[in-house]
């Protein structure tokens, strides 16, 4: 397979015009079981909308403490579950922490219920039982039968708009619920504020502000129905507030066109004929309700669901056809599903007019590039962005420009560490943007100013208050008393510094090159020659006692242990091999890993 893959990569330009339906090999359901943390719903390559079902809504806290079960729902969907609460428009894929789950929509019929019910008793609320036998997940398309209300739910998407199609039974009590309370990694105070405006009997707009992994996040929306609703209403679950003003003069619970609060659910009522399809277009914007509506009108001007679905599949086929593999069918499923997952993030983060909200919370315009967000760089700098330099060079160029825009807007003057939705959540370790920038510049992908990029790398790497960098600069390592991840931080900073050195060398900055090459050797300060492993070191330069190479707790490593992190010296493998006793001992050690 490797031989065929390399051959195909070399001949991508020659196969581009003979597109195959490679999307047929994509199985988005892969990764949704146990701890895969992927979602099965509809999205397009690098899309801002990820329209997917939530199989439960688990609170981040329980009895005032962290609820471990919430981790199972990083992507909102768990294959083992048997109920669906609704379909929301934003999701993270493959992460070990989470956020999002904005604007949950659920069709129902019969008696109106405004609470979601429970997994053990779905009929006590608006959620529904479902079966995987009646579920289809494809690239750009999702379908499921909602058993309790006999409704067929279908989803597709464009870059900034999700499209729903609900096939109802005959009923004079059909409803579509919009839950503005629901969210992934949710907790009672996560919603800072929500606002909804009913523009007419088929269009509503609004926004939601949340304080989660991204601490200041606002998402605007426009929601359009293919059929006029006959009535609507809302329920406000806010705790009693000290001041509510004089809005009590109105009955805001039914047919009132302007609603605001922290904990809101809305409903829209319809009469439906047997097998009648009611469609919903749901557009997002980081900037304004007006922009969300503009995104909707630009990307899905009509109501042809099948056309949008076919367009989404065509977009996936365009990307998947960049690599051809000659292997058996099962391997093709694994390969193209993995390729599909690789092309979900980073996500588009600007409107069709180029506007986006920057890290400074001001509105900016992406001039000459697409602005991207969702940079999980600790996870992606090693392989994903180098991969993009080969088969997504234009996009990776835009991604680097997005990182530079992030730096320019940063109050701390730092490149992104883990950014999404105009926030940096500072998750994981290292300053791995510098690796992505350096690789793109040296390979000729980045079309921006390399001198400015180098300065951004230097400034980021010298932010002394961030995660032990001051100690790292002064002592050549981070004392274990100062950080619970002191060793992994030191190792990752050392690699990043080597990247900065290579960029400085390309730009003929000799003094910078020498400084950062010296810093790139700091890994040696955590290498214990007596045992051949990386080991936490105290401020007095003695190695930490009670050392366990297998343990992942209190040993100075993040999501790892000394056994796997001791091999992380990609900038100087020859010296690492020497320190571990030569090639034979090194190979033997690898074999026992």
Task: Identify what each model region corresponds to.
Residues 19-385, 389-435, 441-491, 499-525, ...:
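Accessory carbohydrate-recognition regions in carbohydrate-active enzymes
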């Amino acid at each position: 397979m490797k031989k065929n893959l390399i051959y195909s990569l070399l001949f991508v330009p020659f196969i581009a015009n003979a597109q195959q339906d490679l999307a047929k090999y994509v199985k988005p359901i892969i990764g949704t079981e146990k701890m895969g943390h992927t979602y099965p719903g509809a999205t397009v390559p690098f899309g801002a909308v990820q329209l997917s079902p939530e199989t439960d809504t688990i609170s981040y806290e329980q009895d005032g403490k962290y609820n471990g079960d919430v981790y199972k729902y990083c992507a909102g969907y768990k294959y083992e579950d048997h109920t669906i609460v609704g379909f929301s428009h934003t999701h993270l894929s493959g992460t070990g922490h989470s956020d999002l789950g904005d604007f949950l929509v659920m069709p129902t019929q019969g008696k109106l219920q405004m609470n979601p019910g429970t997994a053990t008793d779905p009929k006590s609320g608006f959620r529904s039982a479902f079966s995987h036998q009646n579920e289809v997940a494809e690239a750009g398309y999702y379908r499921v039968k909602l058993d309790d209300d006999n409704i067929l739910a279908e989803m597709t998407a464009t870059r900034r708009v999700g499209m729903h199609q609900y096939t109802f039974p005959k009923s004079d009590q059909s409803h579509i619920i919009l839950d503005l309370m629901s969210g992934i990694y949710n907790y009672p105070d996560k919603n800072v504020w929500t606002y909804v405006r009913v523009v007419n009997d088929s269009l509503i707009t609004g926004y939601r502000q949340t304080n989660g992994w991204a601490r200041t996040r606002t998402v605007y929306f426009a929601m359009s129905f293919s059929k006029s609703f006959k009535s609507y209403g809302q329920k406000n679950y806010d705790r009693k507030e000290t001041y509510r003003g004089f809005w009590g003069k109105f009955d805001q619970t039914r047919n009132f066109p302007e609603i605001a609060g922290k904990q809101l659910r809305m409903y829209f009522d319809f009469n439906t004929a047997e097998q009648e399809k009611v469609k919903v277009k749901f557009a997002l914007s980081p900037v304004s309700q007006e922009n969300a509506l503009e995104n909707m009108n630009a990307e899905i001007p009509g109501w042809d669901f099948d056309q949008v679905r076919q367009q989404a599949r065509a977009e996936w086929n365009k990307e998947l056809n960049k690599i051809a593999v000659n292997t058996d069918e099962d391997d093709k499923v694994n390969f193209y599903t993995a390729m599909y997952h690789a092309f979900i993030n980073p996500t588009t983060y600007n409107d069709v007019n180029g506007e986006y909200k920057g890290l400074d919370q001001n509105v900016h315009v992406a001039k000459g590039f697409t602005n991207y967000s969702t940079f999980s760089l600790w996870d992606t700098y090693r392989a994903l962005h180098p991969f993009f330099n080969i088969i997504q060079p234009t996009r990776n160029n835009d991604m680097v420009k997005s990182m530079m825009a992030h730096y320019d807007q940063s109050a701390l003057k730092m490149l992104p560490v883990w950014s999404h939705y105009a926030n940096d959540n500072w998750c994981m370790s290292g300053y791995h943007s510098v690796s992505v920038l350096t690789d793109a510049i040296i390979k000729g992908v980045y079309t921006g100013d390399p001198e400015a990029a180098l300065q951004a790398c230097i400034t980021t790497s010298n932010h002394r208050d961030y995660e032990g960098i001051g100690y790292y600069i002064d002592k050549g390592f981070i004392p274990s008393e100062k950080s619970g991840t002191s060793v992994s931080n030191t190792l990752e900073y050392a690699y990043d510094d080597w990247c900065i050195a290579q960029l400085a060398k390309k730009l003929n900055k000799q003094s910078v090159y020498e400084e950062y090459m010296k810093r790139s050797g700091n890994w040696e300060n955590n290498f214990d020659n007596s045992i051949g492993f990386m080991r936490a070191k105290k401020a007095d330069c003695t190695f930490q006692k009670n050392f366990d190479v297998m343990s992942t707790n209190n040993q100075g490593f993040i999501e790892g242990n000394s056994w796997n992190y001791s091999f992380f010296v990609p900038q100087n493998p020859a010296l690492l091999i020497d320190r571990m006793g030569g090639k034979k001992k090194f190979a033997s050690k690898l074999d026992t890993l």
